[in-house]
């Protein structure tokens, strides 16, 4: 982003996305800039309803279950709203430290998903279940997907796979669709393929 001329502001990891959003709002007000607010704009889920969701039902003959991570909630909400019309059951994946499953909020290393509060446009009626994943499982899957499938994904994708695998144990059969929303190229400066929970992941 810096190479493209962006003014990059970093916030404390302990502040989570709430801290990042606060910094963005302050910046927008100070410099009369546009704050896109993916966490509050209905354009976020609507974009997925009219693109990804329709693509899934057009290209796949049948879907029984949909599994996706939730950060802003845009992907899950937009896709789940559409899939409910097809009697698909929809499941959220979150890391430990996210509050969607009722647990306490704390820092986690799985990036791109996890919420300190319930996203404003995430309708609870769309949610058929929530899987809370350990960071280590997410990163183990990052390495597994690279080694076995040649997929270079990020930790939120590893968590999504873990959620799909956990669901598979429960349902025995049926078509499960999940989303890999990020690539490992975004995290090459970190130890993404050699993650250890006991080490600092910076």
Feature map (PLM): residue ranges:
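Glycine-rich beta-alpha junction loops
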Residues: 40-41, 71-74, 94-99, 105-106, ...
């Amino acid at each position: 982003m810096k190479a493209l001329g962006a003014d990059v502001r970093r916030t404390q990891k302990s502040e989570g996305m709430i801290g990042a959003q606060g910094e963005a709002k302050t910046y927008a007000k100070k410099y009369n800039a546009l704050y896109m607010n993916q966490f509050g704009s209905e354009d976020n889920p609507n974009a997925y309803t009219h693109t990804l969701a329709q693509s899934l039902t057009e290209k796949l003959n049948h879907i029984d279950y949909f599994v996706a991570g939730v950060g802003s909630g845009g992907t899950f909400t937009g896709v789940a709203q559409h899939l409910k019309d097809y009697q698909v059951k929809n499941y959220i994946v979150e890391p430990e430290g996210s509050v969607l499953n009722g647990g306490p909020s704390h820092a986690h290393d799985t990036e791109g998903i996890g919420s300190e509060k319930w996203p404003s446009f995430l309708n609870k009626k769309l949610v058929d279940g929530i899987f809370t994943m350990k960071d280590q499982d997410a990163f183990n899957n990052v390495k597994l997907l690279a080694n076995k499938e040649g997929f270079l994904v990020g930790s939120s994708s590893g968590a999504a796979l873990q959620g799909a695998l956990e669901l598979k144990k429960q349902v025995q059969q049926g078509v499960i669709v999940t989303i890999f929303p990020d690539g490992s190229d975004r995290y090459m400066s970190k130890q993404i393929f050699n993650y250890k929970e006991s080490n600092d992941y910076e």
